Amino acid sequence: MCIRDSPDGHYWGARFPAISIRDMVRAEAQLANILGIRRFAAVIGGSMGGARTLEWMMMYPQRVASAGVLAVGPCASADQIGWQTTQILAITSDPAWQQGGYHGTGREPTMGLGIARRIAHLSYRSEQELERRFANRPAPGEDPIGEDLSMQGRYAVQSYLDHQASKLISRFDACCYVLLTDALNRHDIGRGRGGIHHVLETCEVPAVICAVDTDRLYPLRQIEELADHLPYLSLIHISEPTRRY
């Protein structure tokens, strides 16, 4: 985090305390208290927002009249942790990371952050969508199969990922990215509550769960685990080549 209110007056950087999805929900609940919101008609979210929605259902069921959960499972899977820790490694391996103390040095780990974004963005899109949009075509005006590797151009999908990386670098801090990605790795609604099935089966918040059959990051198996154990639930299956959240 680039907030400059640490005890020593310097940027927090990578020294900022680790946070969890539950920490985020506690902060949201405190904000709701300040705003005078006692109960929500619906709490809705996808991916990290879906993880927070699940925690709202478990932590503050009396404040949630209904919930909508998209693209998330009851806990981070080995596959998801693998995707996400690889993104973190891309950032922390950048020499400009400087052990997370890069703020104010004039050097930021933008290369690592861009690689992390490319990795993440591949997990956000389905194989079918990428093939339909790009296949193995070259980027406009470029030749990716030239004989000289130092001079060759890009494939269309490379150009697309470069664009997504460039957009994120201009608006996001690398320490924030690491902190939030680590929070997703920690996601587990059953931790300290008797296990996933127990906490789901005792939840009384009515919920709609949406599952996309082409989602490579949050597969149907995980979504169906929620559906199998939540007592007040509607499950919606979406067959869609494009992941839209």
Predicted regions, residues:
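Acidic catalytic loop of the alpha/beta-hydrolase fold
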Residues: 214-218
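Short beta-strand/loop motif that positions the catalytic acidic residue
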Residues: 203, 209-211
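Gly/Pro-rich cap/lid or specificity-loop segments adjacent to the active site
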Residues: 4-51, 58, 62-85
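Alpha/beta-hydrolase-fold enzymes
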Residues: 63-65, 69-167
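Short alpha-helix in the alpha/beta-hydrolase fold that links the catalytic acid
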Residues: 192-196, 219-229
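Short, conserved loop/helix-junction motifs that constitute active-site signature segments
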Residues: 200-204, 229-231
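Single conserved hydrophobic/aromatic residue that forms the stacking wall/gate
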Residues: 1-3, 236-245
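Active-site nucleophile elbow and catalytic-triad environment of alpha/beta-hydrolase enzymes
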Residues: 163-164, 179-199
